[in-house]
UniProtKB/Swiss-Prot annotation:
GO cellular component assignments: cytoplasm
Keyword Aminoacyl-tRNA synthetase: yes
Protein name: Serine--tRNA ligase
Database matches in Pfam families: Seryl_tRNA_N (PF02403), tRNA-synt_2b (PF00587)
Subcellular location(s) of the protein: Cytoplasm
Comment text on domains: Consists of two distinct domains, a catalytic core and a N-terminal extension that is involved in tRNA binding.
Transmembrane regions: none
InterPro entries tied to this protein: aa-tRNA-synt_IIb, aa-tRNA-synth_II, aa-tRNA-synth_II/BPL/LPL, Ser-tRNA-ligase_type_1, Ser-tRNA-synth_1_N, SerRS_1_N_sf, SerRS_core, tRNA-bd_arm
Alphabetical UniProt keywords: Aminoacyl-tRNA synthetase, ATP-binding, Cytoplasm, Ligase, Nucleotide-binding, Protein biosynthesis
């Protein structure tokens, strides 16, 4: 979320950075919405001030036994009481319109981010290692996994539909080993604190990290049908009894509860009940980890705060129709180790480089060839100021192999912190917004693919990387045995 005051102070600078993403200038539109909000606030405050003044004048008129003036003032106060709810509503509507507009605007790229339209304009920052050579034609992971009878897409489709997989035996254990290895390195050597967060979160958490409202179609949400129906019945009963203040506060925080009550006359009970009971499946552990500091004021002596989690992640992949339809590259459910850092503004640049090096290190120990890309302005994520992608070499992809993304490391500045109201207090005692960073450390499912394809043997077996063998009970080769 952007600061409207900063936009007002320098709209040209805002638009100069914003248009680097290939978007049209927007500062004046935001200023117009803020002007409308200020105008509505002024009208409401003037009406309230006049009501207060008139109420006082009524007492003065009565003391002076000026009944005519007292009656005129009482009539004025009565009229103000009638008009003020509409003025208050106008303030709320104008404030909501500005907040909605600001919430749908992406972060501004840093000055050193290369300009470009899409992934073809990303810049190679570095390489590590070399591509492996084979005396045979490497196969894709799904052919190897199915031949081993340890990767079953058909069974997964019967259970859940497309873009799911069932892993068995050695490959299931290998995926678990990769995740545990990543987690151990990050916690024991890189200074991250392990967190086991919920996989279901509220709207507020998804808004805080900027998945909502812009990317709702890419998410999975769940709602308990029985709770919805029960809550509907209780709502209707209290509405009929003209006692809406006693609607049960079952699942919702006070701030949201009050807002919903205000909208009773405009919304159907079914819609409200669903909103009260729904939760979102996390698309990444970035969401719960980053939101752990929501509505907090941290001591800057404790920063940077580094957290990591190994979780399942869920994505609808609404924009991926027809892409990567075979194999495990693009799944609705996948495992990932996430890295999150919360820093001061002065620390965030160095922390970004450090986070990238942590993600690189686990791939180096797996002896996988990869390259690091600096994403251009047209390919950056919504909340990012600057992003590095790590693309690992997968010899079984396409004709002759391909680089595929396995990690994204992004610095977000105070963009998410403003949405979450996450601040820190320094030596001067004044609170200020923190900076947030997130990165994959790395995607476990894609790391599994990379290991399968890079460590495949001519007979279809998979050699287990040395660093993973202790997690596999000493197993050195996964075969169909």
């Amino acid at each position: 979320m952007h600061d409207i005051k900063a936009i007002r102070d320098n709209p040209t600078a805002f638009d100069d950075a914003y248009t680097r993403r290939g978007l049209a200038p927007i500062a004046q539109s935001l200023i117009d919405k803020d002007d409308a909000r200020r105008k509505a606030i002024l009208a409401s405050e003037q009406a309230q001030a006049r009501r207060n003044a008139a109420s006082k004048e009524i007492g003065d008129a009565k003391k002076a036994k000026d009944n005519v003036r007292a009656e005129a003032l009482m009539a004025e106060v009565a009229e103000l009481k009638t008009t003020m709810p509409a003025l208050d509503a106008a303030v709320k509507d104008a404030d909501a319109a500005l907040k909605k507009a600001l919430s749908e605007i992406p972060n501004l790229p840093l000055a050193d981010v290369p300009e470009g339209k899409d992934e073809h304009d990303n810049e190679v920052r570095s390489h590590y290692g070399v591509k492996r050579s084979y005396a045979f034609t490497p196969k894709p992971h799904y052919e190897l996994g199915e031949a081993l009878k340890q990767m079953d897409f058909e069974a997964a489709a019967k259970l859940s539909g497309a873009r799911f997989v069932v892993l068995k035996k050695g490959l299931a254990r290998l995926e678990r080993a990769i995740g545990q290895f990543f987690l151990d390195v990050h916690t024991e050597e890189h200074g991250y604190t392990e967190v086991n967060p919920p996989l279901l979160v509220r709207d507020e958490a998804m808004f805080g990290t900027a998945q909502l409202p812009k990317f709702e179609d890419d998410q999975f949400f769940v709602g308990n049908g029985n709770n919805v129906r029960r809550l509907q019945q209780e709502m209707r009963a209290t509405i009929e009894a003209d006692d809406v203040k006693n609607i049960p506060d079952m699942f919702v925080p006070k701030s949201k509860y009050d807002r919903l009550l205000e909208n009773y006359l405009r919304l159907e009970t079914e819609q409200i009940a669903l909103e009260l009971t729904r939760r979102w499946l996390i698309p990444t552990a970035e969401v719960p980890l980053t939101n752990l500091v929501r509505e907090s004021i941290l001591d800057e002596k404790e920063l940077p705060l580094r957290m990591t989690a190994l979780t399942q992640c869920f994505r609808a992949e609404a924009g991926a129709a027809g892409r990567d339809t075979r194999g495990m590259i693009r799944q609705h459910q996948f495992t990932k180790v996430e890295l999150v850092s919360v820093t001061t503004p002065e620390q965030s640049k160095d922390e970004h480089e450090r986070m990238l090096s942590c993600a690189e290190e686990v791939l180096r120990r797996l002896e996988l060839h990869y390259r690091v890309m600096t994403l251009c302005t047209g390919d950056m994520g919504f909340a990012s100021q600057k992003t590095y992608d790590i693309e690992v070499w997968m010899p079984g992809q396409g004709e002759g192999g391909a680089y595929r993304e396995i990690s994204s490391c992004s610095v977000c500045g105070d963009f998410q912190a403003r949405r979450m109201d996450a601040r820190s207090r320094g030596p001067d005692g004044k609170p200020r917004f923190v900076h947030t960073l997130n990165g994959s450390g790395t995607a476990v499912g894609r790391a599994l693919i990379a290991v399968i394809e890079n460590y495949q043997q001519e007979d279809g077996s998979i050699a287990v990387p040395t660093v993973l063998q202790r997690y596999m009970g000493g197993l050195k080769v996964i075969s169909n045995g």
